[in-house]
Amino acid sequence: KAAGLPIAFDFSDRWTPEYLQATLPWVDIALLSCSHLPAGQREQALDQARRLGAKIAVATAGQEGSWVKWEGRLFHAPAAQAAQVADTMGAGDAYFAAFLCSLLQTAGEEGLFARDLSQRIPRAMEQAAAYAAKTCALEGAFGGGVPLAGRTELTPLEKDLSL
């Protein structure tokens, strides 16, 4: 952060209020997995993340979609429907990666937060949801990664990271 680079952090679903309080002053973009929370508590969690220092707070809740809190505004995007679901492992990670890629690709030379985000955030959420849905069509890699040695071409999903 001292170098002027934005810090993004995925808190997963194992965050506590105490952990957020200790961590969020150092975080610019926070992702909270909130599938385990009722709808009202999700917005409270986003508000808490913003109060504690995150410029952008993101909450994901699987099939219920995602929410982003920025500058007092709450954005919602529905989940994209996967053509087929093989495994949801990694969908949240894929969402956050695509969300960040979209914001970075539209940032311009002035930096990530210099331009108005009111139109960039909904676009990033839509792209992130679509990418997460595509990820659900793949088997998860926990404990069973795919060897990369000798590969010369990207998979269609890897090519799609260009958004």
PLM region spans:
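Conserved phosphate-binding/catalytic region of the ribokinase-like
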Residues: 43-163
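Conserved beta-alpha-beta core of the PfkB/ribokinase-like small-molecule kinase fold
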Residues: 1-48, 65
